[in-house]
Amino acid sequence: MNSELFSPYTIKDVTLKNRIVMSPMCMYSSENEDGQVTNFHLIHYGTRAAGQVGLVMIEATAVLPEGRISNKDLGIWDDSLIEGLHKTTTFIHDNGAKAAIQLAHAGRKAELETDALAPSAIPFNETMKIPVEMSIQQIKNTILAFQQAAVRSKQAGFDVIEIHGAHGYLINEFLSPLSNKRTDEYGGSPEKRYRFLREIIDSINEVWNGPLFVRISANDYHPDGLTVQDYIQYTKWMKEQGVDLIDCSSGAVVPARIDVYPGYQVQYAKHIKEHANIATGAVGLITTGAQAEQILTNNEADLIFIGRELLRNPYFPRIAANELGFELEEPYQYERAPGKISTNK
């Protein structure tokens, strides 16, 4: 039986064997607080590759030490971090998947002893510290850090880079009028609020010619915040700059109530795909093969990002293939366990 979910997908010169992407999820497991990969990361990501995920995207990886969400985040701010990341991509490639990295800066959500940086001195909520408004020089330094991280990503063997522009972290803070109250060239109009991301994309394009994704929060869930309509223009600009795919999440730039239900963010992937004419990834409570297949069949997205379901079961692709009646090519080491895998949890 044919399946959209298990059909290949090519972006530039990178071909994914199927449409399943491991969504980036922080593991907070750099135990020595130095940004280094640990054995846990090798097992964690290698297992999902062996489980037949097409693209394994590692967690938000900080481009600067002060840009970590926590002191146990992975980092890519120094050449000494390349070796561990290269071991990770080797594990992923050896188990049949492509490897992606999400480059990130936590902005005002950095929970470290050092000052948190943000476009404006506005805390996320009343319990978090007031961030320091970034100077122009700090902005330029951060843009350079993203570029240097892209160089290291190439050296570490990653096939895809994703820029983290979602979930209330630094880039998202610049994009949203709720967190960006600047009156200089980086704030005010949508064009000026987009400038920080524009310059990051331009800087990465100077050193990286592989597939480039951007994760966005397509809805601020606030009456004065951004909606998916606002992101149509943003994503059109991203496409003009050569971004290949928009990973469509939502929320977390300010505290907000979100009505969560199966596939609740697919609407954003569909809307941006249709109106910005760019490839999209759907993410958020996608938990079955049938659900993922329908999203692709309905042309609502091009890739399916699976998060918590892959934490629950690293062999989700095998279960999805059985569910869809698709014969998945298994690693030879698993051939002694033929037959259908139970979908019971």
From Swiss-Prot:
InterPro entries: Aldolase_TIM (IPR013785), NADPH_DH_bac (IPR023663), OxRdtase_FMN_N (IPR001155), YqjM-like (IPR044152). It is an enzyme of class 1 (oxidoreductase). Substrate binds at Y28, H164, G165, A166, H167. GO terms for molecular function: FMN binding; NADP binding; NADPH dehydrogenase activity. Its cofactor is FMN. Gene3D superfamilies: Aldolase class I. FMN binds at S23, P24, M25, C26, A60, Q102, R215, G307, R308. Signal peptide: none annotated. Its EC number is 1.6.99.1. It catalyses: A + NADPH + H(+) = AH2 + NADP(+). Pfam families: Oxidored_FMN (PF00724). The keyword Oxidoreductase applies. GO terms for biological process: response to toxic substance. The keyword DNA repair does not apply. Keywords: Detoxification, Flavoprotein, FMN, NADP, Oxidoreductase. Disulfide bonds: none annotated. Catalyzes the reduction of the double bond of an array of alpha,beta-unsaturated aldehydes and ketones. It also reduces the nitro group of nitroester and nitroaromatic compounds. It could have a role in detoxification processes. Homotetramer. Belongs to the NADH:flavin oxidoreductase/NADH oxidase family. NamA subfamily. This is NADPH dehydrogenase. It comes from Bacillus thuringiensis subsp. konkukian (strain 97-27). The gene is namA.
